[in-house]
Design a protein with these regions (language model features):
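Short, ordered, surface-exposed loop/turn motifs in non-cytosolic proteins
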Residues: 14-34, 38-41, 331, 429, ...
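Conserved, single-site charged/polar hotspot
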Residues: 1, 21-25, 38, 48-50, ...
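A short, amphipathic beta-strand motif
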Residues: 4-12, 100
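Short, acidic Ser/Thr/Gly-rich low-complexity loop/linker segments typical of extracellular
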Residues: 32-59, 345-347
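Primarily a LysM-type cell-wall glycan-binding module
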Residues: 332, 353-361, 430, 452-458, ...
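Short alpha-helical segments in extracytoplasmic peptidoglycan/chitin-binding modules
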Residues: 276, 283, 335-338, 365-370, ...
Length: 566
């Protein structure tokens, strides 16, 4: 029998917090226990082999059975609700990486609940008809092609009451590709399909296809309207590697700016005017390149374009890979990010090289980071590694900032008595918005509201999403029951989520203020707070002057270095 592989990664808060000691049980299709594992300090289990069937079955469009063997996983941890994932497809020669996102138990919760997710066969093996509609241009469109990070996915048909989840764009594409096609397909077939998936999603965002109709999401997971997405499913190594390389590349027609509407179907039981998923396998086996495959199904003048506008990223990729011997501000940025990330992931070694100089310790930290997050462990900071480091840095620093805010607000243990609804304003609304911001880090279906003290439509949507998540009537009104649930959830997070390593005593960074700087931007970049900068420098206001020298608290290893914004 053929062999495939399974690796489980238990994390929470957008990967900012690895969960060690999670008990993982792997069962075969009939429920027999095969492995009992425990996650390490990175939240990861060893990769285990599992029997499956030969990959030739998943490369044959006429095979009517399951081209894989299914397994089930149960994840349990003290202080967290449990997760059971069934019908996980394991393919010949492929490693399935299963993300286990556990939800902290509420403060008053006596026993864990169990969430169940079923995976099953990919959409290409389904006979469901597709009715994908879209345009290359719309009266209401964005001016630039932007990678939405995160992208908001509605887990149902457009008009259904299903929940929305937010995921990073690369993770979304990996999920869709793993849900749509077989990971055992030839390389160029995989690439052509992934280009179509990326471009389809970017077309929905660019034309504001759903948001212009009043919906609060970017795309659905309904294959009748959009493309498959199974929240909580495993991602396959062959797909993950390609997406990391091309997630910001898309298909457009020559002379046009907008992402082409790349409709597709399986091409066997369902036919369409767009790309045939099974047809890409035949064309790839004939030696066609990904672009040639795309031009076979779409207009002959389509081309591959790239956008570097990615929302939610602290620093954009400099355009040139960083490696041993590289120097400069970009190297310094990565060193700062890695030294902060290692507080949450202590297996990453400390960067002790001089600031801005890519030497042995930087190489070791980069390589370990790549190993932990399923990137090619070559020690080179290319596009995929840069954006993953940047994304994780944003996640860990956001948690630290929220913790600092909670101390400043003095949340306490007794909820406010005021009943809040859309139109309310004031300190209680700020408290509400803060609680929702914290909860949104651990509950993927709860969107993050702006913290402005005004109960607007965004806060109302967040409240209703939270109410659905905790089985309250989603009326958008914050009365006693909702306040209690908010506090129970918030206190449960504080009690059950492991804290990162304490910040080491570091030196300071001398920072020369330049045009466009603000205390908030500087604090975000160096993982500190505005208050900490003001205290260290004896500032009584937020006003900065160009050329002013500030001392910035540093968690890095170098005691002092001078940094000037370019």
């Amino acid at each position: 029998m053929a062999i495939g592989y399974l690796n489980i990664q238990a994390r929470t808060a957008h990967d900012a917090v690895p969960l060690s000691g999670v008990q993982i049980r792997i069962f075969d299709f009939w429920g027999n226990s095969l492995y009992v594992l425990s996650t390490d300090e990175n939240g990861e289990t060893p990769t285990v082999p599992l029997e499956t069937i030969d990959k030739s079955y998943s490369q044959n469009p006429y095979f009517s059975g399951n081209a894989f063997v299914s397994y089930h996983v149960l994840a349990q941890a003290s202080g967290f609700n449990s997760l059971y994932v069934s019908d996980i497809p394991i393919y010949d020669g492929e490693t399935a990486f299963l993300p286990v996102t556990l939800i902290p138990m509420q403060e008053t919760q006596r026993s864990p609940l169990q969430t169940e997710i079923s995976i099953g066969k990919p959409a290409v093996a389904s006979h469901e008809m597709r009715h994908q509609e879209g345009e290359e241009t719309e009266p209401r469109i964005l001016r630039q092609v932007v990678i939405p990070n995160p992208i908001t996915v509605h887990l149902g048909t457009p008009g259904s009451s299903a929940r929305d989840v937010q995921v990073t764009f690369p993770d979304y594409v990996k999920n869709v590709a793993s849900s749509e096609i077989y990971p055992t397909w030839p390389e160029n077939a995989l690439r052509a399909n992934i280009y179509a998936i990326i471009t389809f999603a970017l077309n929905r965002v660019f034309t504001e296809w759903y948001r212009s109709k009043g919906y609060g999401f970017d795309i659905t997971n309904s294959t009748a309207y959009d493309q498959a997405f199974v929240y909580g499913r495993p991602i396959y190594g062959s797909i993950s590697r390609i997406v990391d390389e091309i997630f910001n590349e898309y298909v457009r027609r020559q002379g046009q700016h907008s992402p082409y509407f790349t409709s597709f179907c399986n091409g066997t039981s369902v036919t369409c005017n767009g790309l045939s998923q099974w047809g890409t396998v035949t064309l790839s086996n004939q030696g066609l390149s990904p672009l040639e495959i795309l031009r076979y199904y779409y207009p002959k003048d389509v081309e591959i374009a790239q956008t570097d506008i990615i929302t939610g990223v602290v620093s954009s990729y400099p355009g040139t890979p960083l490696r041993m011997g590289s120097t400069g501000l970009d190297v310094q940025t990565i060193q700062t990010y890695l030294n902060r990330i290692r507080r949450n992931y202590p297996a990453i070694p400390a960067v002790t090289d001089p600031a801005g100089s890519f030497q042995n310790s930087t190489n070791a930290a980069v390589t370990k980071f790549q190993n932990i997050f399923n990137l090619t462990p070559d020690g080179i900071v290319g596009k995929s590694t840069w954006y993953k480091i940047s994304s994780l840095y944003a996640a860990v620093t956001r948690l630290a900032e929220l913790d600092s805010e909670g101390t400043s607000l003095g949340i306490g243990t007794v909820p406010p008595s005021a009943v809040l609804r859309q139109g309310s304003r004031g300190q209680d609304v700020i408290t509400l918005q803060y609680l929702l911001n914290v909860i949104s880090e651990y509950y993927p279906s709860v969107p993050r509201p702006a913290q402005d003290g005004i109960f607007g439509s965004g806060t109302a949507q967040s409240v209703m999403a939270f109410q659905r998540a905790v089985n309250l009537s989603p009326d958008g009104i914050v009365g006693p029951r909702t306040w209690k649930a908010l506090y129970d959830t918030y206190q449960g997070i504080g009690q059950n989520v492991p804290l990162p390593s304490p910040e080491p005593d570091g030196g300071t960074i001398r920072y020369v203020v330049r045009s466009g700087d603000s205390l908030w931007l500087i604090a975000q970049k160096y993982n500190t707070t505005v208050d900490a900068i003001k205290r260290l420098n004896g500032l009584t206001s937020d006003i900065l002057n160009i050329g002013q020298v500030l001392n910035i608290p540093s968690s890095g290893s170098a005691p002092y270095f001078e940094y000037t914004v370019r």
